[in-house]
Amino acid sequence: MQKIRFYYISLSGNTSSFVQRVSQYIKTTHHREVESLNIKDLKGKAITVDGPFVSFLPTYLEGGNGIDTGFQEILTGNLQKFLEYQGNFRYCLGIIGSGNRNFNKQFCLTAFQYAEQFGFPVIDVFELRGTDEDVERISKHILASFEKVEEKIDVSY
């Protein structure tokens, strides 16, 4: 079985908290090795990946309503740069969006836009720090994504 890898960006700590909880759930419940990296910690340094991963992306927007009156993504562009660098997006099995439902149509909008731009699915979404139910549900979706890849190739890391 291959290591499960997460690449994400967290600014307020909500996404980091959720990634840690998902990682712990997968480790203890499914006995899988998990590795995660907050892209913010790279401080602009570029890295190339060589195996499957899942991304987590919070939504930070300013201006407009995000749909028909425009918007500007703020603070999370480093994840986009990471995905673009050396074609890293080709290894992304999907993205998990987070946001605040108070923002209506903008809830997790950035994750859906990244999915469209890069051609990978939105695996799931959660609000703010996520609930225990979110952790369990999303962990199952992540494991299913990795199992599909493992069925296609014989991976022994």
Model-based region annotation:
Residues 1-72, 76-77:
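N-terminal beta1-alpha1-beta2 submodule of the flavodoxin-like/Rossmannoid cofactor-binding fold
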Residues 49-157:
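FMN-binding flavodoxin-like domain, especially the glycine-rich phosphate-binding loop
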